[in-house]
Amino acid sequence: MSRPSLTRFLIEEQHAGRIDPELRQLITIVSRACKRISIAVSKGALGGVLGDAGTGNVQGEAQKKLDVLSNDILLEANAWGGHLAACASEEMDHSQPVPDQYPSGDFLLLFDPLDGSSNIDVNVSVGTIFSVLRAPKGTEKPGDEHFLQPGTQQVAAGYCIYGPSTMLVLTLGHGTHAFTLEREEGSFLLTQADMRVPEDTAEFAINMSNQRHWEPAMQAYVGDLLAGKDGARGKDFNMRWIASMVADVHRILTRGGIFIYPWDKKDAAKPGKLRLMYEANPMGMLVEQAGGAATTGRERILDIQPTQLHQRVPVFLGSKNEVAEATRYHVEFDKAQG
């Protein structure tokens, strides 16, 4: 029996009344753009797209050539279809409405065009993360303020990981599903329906080099993980860290674990490292739809009301019981501080 294609999956979701035709079209076009990005990534040095672009983004980060190329591919692909009202990207200062010469649709698309791009020159898996919101009714030209919706308002979220195989992981609010790109026919085929994150885990993903900058609750939590079976947790934990959020979260969706990027004192003015709208919200939705959890260490990520397009937050996501345990350390520390 042949595997269903992404196209068939989306049509069946539409026929079941779970999505409308415009959302189906949007996801289809995003998936096509991801195929183009996959081709560019896979060429590596042969494509002349490695290295720095010589520019910086709104975050103050140096852009890679592939950051810029991936951003342009997504903007171009989504400009003319009539399903989109505006786009916002981690690589752009402000949101961008569809050009005047094209029809405007009902949806807002946010994306990190190439997450983990700092690793691209060393051939580590990278990916594209995206989130879809509805444009507020009556909005003719959406601006940044119209994107400031909590993650609970997302109608779809996903990522495409460019690794040994190219995979699209998608949620439309009814489970999380994985599609693998069959390169010969150029189609994404369903390879894992209803992904489930195990509730318990013995793996954690964190950048330990920042340990000296963590707050006490974080120090205590990770200290107990490292103490293993001789400590308060009573079991050994393994650490995994790829430094590419897409790759780390994909592993957690596949076999469980907890991904942590906490607030730290190294840059105390920033509330976190990862972006709420482009990374935390879509990844949080994907993980929750797979039975996991996503918090800031103190509150559910999807409940946060954004105040800025490029807002940052701490991120704890993955296996439900372990995320709850990490959150407990922070809540109890706050109570003890009065």
Curated annotation (Swiss-Prot):
<feature type="binding site">
    <location>
        <begin position="115"/>
        <end position="118"/>
    </location>
    <ligand>
        <name>substrate</name>
    </ligand>
</feature>
<dbReference type="Pfam" id="PF18913">
    <property type="entry name" value="FBPase_C"/>
</dbReference>
<keyword id="KW-0378">Hydrolase</keyword>
<keyword id="KW-0460">Magnesium</keyword>
<dbReference type="GO" id="GO:0042132">
    <property type="term" value="F:fructose 1,6-bisphosphate 1-phosphatase activity"/>
</dbReference>
<keyword id="KW-0963">Cytoplasm</keyword>
<feature type="binding site">
    <location>
        <position position="273"/>
    </location>
    <ligand>
        <name>substrate</name>
    </ligand>
</feature>
<dbReference type="GO" id="GO:0006000">
    <property type="term" value="P:fructose metabolic process"/>
</dbReference>
<dbReference type="InterPro" id="IPR044015">
    <property type="entry name" value="FBPase_C_dom"/>
</dbReference>
<feature type="binding site">
    <location>
        <position position="90"/>
    </location>
    <ligand>
        <name>Mg(2+) 1</name>
    </ligand>
</feature>
<dbReference type="GO" id="GO:0006094">
    <property type="term" value="P:gluconeogenesis"/>
</dbReference>
<dbReference type="InterPro" id="IPR033391">
    <property type="entry name" value="FBPase_N"/>
</dbReference>
<comment type="similarity">
    <text>Belongs to the FBPase class 1 family.</text>
</comment>
<feature type="binding site">
    <location>
        <position position="207"/>
    </location>
    <ligand>
        <name>substrate</name>
    </ligand>
</feature>
<dbReference type="InterPro" id="IPR000146">
    <property type="entry name" value="FBPase_class-1"/>
</dbReference>
<feature type="binding site">
    <location>
        <position position="115"/>
    </location>
    <ligand>
        <name>Mg(2+) 2</name>
    </ligand>
</feature>
<dbReference type="GO" id="GO:0000287">
    <property type="term" value="F:magnesium ion binding"/>
</dbReference>
<feature type="binding site">
    <location>
        <position position="112"/>
    </location>
    <ligand>
        <name>Mg(2+) 1</name>
    </ligand>
</feature>
<feature type="binding site">
    <location>
        <position position="279"/>
    </location>
    <ligand>
        <name>Mg(2+) 2</name>
    </ligand>
</feature>
<dbReference type="InterPro" id="IPR028343">
    <property type="entry name" value="FBPtase"/>
</dbReference>
<comment type="subunit">
    <text>Homotetramer.</text>
</comment>
<dbReference type="GO" id="GO:0030388">
    <property type="term" value="P:fructose 1,6-bisphosphate metabolic process"/>
</dbReference>
<feature type="binding site">
    <location>
        <position position="114"/>
    </location>
    <ligand>
        <name>Mg(2+) 1</name>
    </ligand>
</feature>
<keyword id="KW-0479">Metal-binding</keyword>
<keyword id="KW-0119">Carbohydrate metabolism</keyword>
<protein>
    <recommendedName>
        <fullName>Fructose-1,6-bisphosphatase class 1</fullName>
        <ecNumber>3.1.3.11</ecNumber>
    </recommendedName>
</protein>
<comment type="pathway">
    <text>Carbohydrate biosynthesis; gluconeogenesis.</text>
</comment>
<dbReference type="GO" id="GO:0005829">
    <property type="term" value="C:cytosol"/>
</dbReference>
<dbReference type="Pfam" id="PF00316">
    <property type="entry name" value="FBPase"/>
</dbReference>
<dbReference type="GO" id="GO:0006002">
    <property type="term" value="P:fructose 6-phosphate metabolic process"/>
</dbReference>
<dbReference type="GO" id="GO:0005737">
    <property type="term" value="C:cytoplasm"/>
</dbReference>
<feature type="binding site">
    <location>
        <position position="112"/>
    </location>
    <ligand>
        <name>Mg(2+) 2</name>
    </ligand>
</feature>
